């Protein structure tokens, strides 16, 4: 998705102009457009014309309309999005208040205006427009003194950082200058990895180099991670895959991607993270039921106690027709993040999202039990008996 323009005021009213560039962007757009918004886009309209002789004919014209959105229809198989509404801006072909359906098209821009842009919608735009959020694969291509940190998306390879440090040669009887420079180089590469790689999106980080550079670098990185208790690196250690490359230049990445080990590793999908989160919830429900709850009221009460470690929520809840209900979910997400909890927004198009929908679409894994919640559970089960 390409962001052309963003005009949002301090009161969160405003508009954004976007260009969907691939099928997945239609899914993002479906989650952005809500009833009551105004949508401006190019569309085809059938127009009746009358000739000088009085005969009536019709032809199709391309025009730009601004609709007040009344209905949204998304075809997940064809990735087509149709938006129905009434015309709210003067147009030579369409009367004010007349109904029309716009079919949003790839590579054709649209402008979406809202009275209130909430944090969940703004974050979705940020993720849809930042290639880092669609990059399943990251790569560190390196040699002594030179490293490129790259992100590999379905359509391109992006260089996010280049690290260059002059490494003096080893001298007989004195390697200290060489070793200090090498350590400084490794440290800068580690910092670049942490700055540019989203581990909740990336499923594999290739570390490619000639010789033993990759092994020595990975040893250094994880030793430092243990010393500093760097949980992000330690928890994602299994995602790092060491492969051969002839140099630290970007063009050597192609060799690494052709490695058969890499190909088999990349067969996983982004949905794997959602599957694991839901699996963790079910395990907690089975083994420590006082730390796993679902349903909006229960989850809100757990949040009031600042007990939520991980919030699992379906994206379909943010498409709720009632603005007050939708705002309630947004406030919950914001609050969990403020209390240092993790928020996982599940796609209702994935199997795990469908399973979560069967559990009301919202669930939480707690840091610690909340006695009042457990008591409520017991009360409700005794009432059922």
From Swiss-Prot:
Q: Which SMART domains match?
A: eRF1_1
The cellular location(s) given in this protein's UniProt record come to: Cytoplasm
Residues that the record marks as modified (Phosphoserine) are 374, 380-382
Q: Does the keyword Repeat apply?
A: no
Which controlled-vocabulary keywords does the entry list? Cytoplasm, Isopeptide bond, Metal-binding, Phosphoprotein, Translation regulation, Ubl conjugation
**InterPro entries per the UniProt record, alphabetical:** eFR1_2_sf (IPR042226), eRF1_1_Pelota (IPR005140), eRF1_2 (IPR005141), eRF1_3 (IPR005142), Pelota/DOM34_N (IPR038069), Ribosomal_eL30-like_sf (IPR029064), Transl-rel_pelota (IPR004405)
Gene Ontology BP terms: nonfunctional rRNA decay; nuclear-transcribed mRNA catabolic process, no-go decay; nuclear-transcribed mRNA catabolic process, non-stop decay; regulation of translation; rescue of stalled ribosome; ribosome disassembly; RNA surveillance
What main location does UniProt list?
Answer: cytoplasm
Question: Could you give a GO molecular-function term held by this entry?
Answer: ribosome binding
Pfam families in the record? eRF1_1 (PF03463), eRF1_2 (PF03464), eRF1_3 (PF03465)
What cofactor is needed?
a divalent metal cation
Covalent crosslink: Glycyl lysine isopeptide (Lys-Gly) (interchain with G-Cter in SUMO2): 162
Gene Ontology CC: cytoplasm; Dom34-Hbs1 complex
Work out whether the entry's keyword set contains Cytoplasm. yes
Query: What function does the entry list?
Result: Component of the Pelota-HBS1L complex, a complex that recognizes stalled ribosomes and triggers the No-Go Decay (NGD) pathway. In the Pelota-HBS1L complex, PELO recognizes ribosomes stalled at the 3' end of an mRNA and engages stalled ribosomes by destabilizing mRNA in the mRNA channel. Following mRNA extraction from stalled ribosomes by the SKI complex, the Pelota-HBS1L complex promotes recruitment of ABCE1, which drives the disassembly of stalled ribosomes, followed by degradation of damaged mRNAs as part of the NGD pathway.
Family to which this protein belongs: Belongs to the eukaryotic release factor 1 family. Pelota subfamily.
Tell me, how does this one assemble? Component of the Pelota-HBS1L complex, also named Dom34-Hbs1 complex, composed of PELO and HBS1L. Interacts with PINK1. Interacts with ABCE1. Interacts with CNOT4.
Q: Can you say what this protein is called?
A: Protein pelota homolog
Name of encoding gene: PELO
């Amino acid at each position: 998705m390409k962001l052309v323009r963003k005009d949002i005021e301090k009161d969160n009213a405003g508009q954004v102009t976007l260009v969907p560039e691939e099928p997945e962007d239609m899914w993002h757009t479906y989650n952005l457009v809500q009833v009551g918004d105004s949508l401006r886009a190019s569309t085809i309209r059938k127009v009746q014309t009358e000739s000088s002789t009085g005969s009536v004919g019709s032809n199709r014209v391309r025009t730009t309309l601004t609709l007040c959105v009344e209905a949204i229809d998304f075809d997940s198989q064809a990735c087509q999005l149709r938006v129905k509404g009434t015309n709210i801006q003067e147009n030579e072909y369409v009367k004010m208040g007349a109904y029309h359906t716009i079919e949003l098209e790839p590579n054709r821009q649209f402008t979406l205006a809202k009275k209130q842009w909430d944090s969940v919608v703004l974050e979705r735009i940020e993720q849809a427009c930042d290639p880092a959020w669609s990059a399943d694969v990251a790569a560190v291509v390196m040699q002594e003194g030179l490293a490129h940190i790259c992100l590999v998306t379905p359509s391109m390879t992006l260089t996010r950082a280049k690290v260059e440090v002059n490494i003096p040669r080893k001298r007989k009887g004195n390697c200290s200058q060489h070793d200090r420079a090498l350590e400084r180089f490794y440290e800068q590469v580690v910092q670049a990895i942490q700055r540019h790689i989203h581990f909740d999106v990336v499923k594999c980080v290739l570390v490619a180099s000639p010789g033993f550079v990759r092994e020595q670098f990975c040893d250094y990185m994880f030793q430092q991670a243990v010393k500093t208790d760097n949980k992000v690196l330690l928890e994602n250690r299994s995602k790092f895959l060491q492969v051969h490359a002839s140099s630290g230049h970007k063009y050597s990445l192609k060799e690494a991607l052709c490695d058969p080990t890499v190909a088999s590793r990349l067969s996983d999908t982004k949905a794997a993270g959602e599957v694991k989160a839901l699996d963790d919830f079910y395990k907690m429900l089975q083994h420590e039921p006082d730390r796993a709850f679902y349903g909006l009221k229960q989850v809100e009460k757990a949040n009031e106690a600042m007990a939520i470690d991980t919030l699992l929520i379906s994206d379909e809840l943010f498409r709720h027709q009632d603005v007050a209900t939708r705002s309630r979910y947004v406030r919950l997400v914001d609050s969990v993040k403020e209390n240092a909890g993790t928020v996982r927004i599940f796609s209702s198009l994935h199997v795990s999202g469908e399973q979560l929908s069967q559990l009301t679409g919202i669930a939480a894994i707690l840091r610690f039990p909340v006695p009042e919640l457990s008591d409520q559970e017991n009360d409700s089960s005794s009432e059922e008996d």
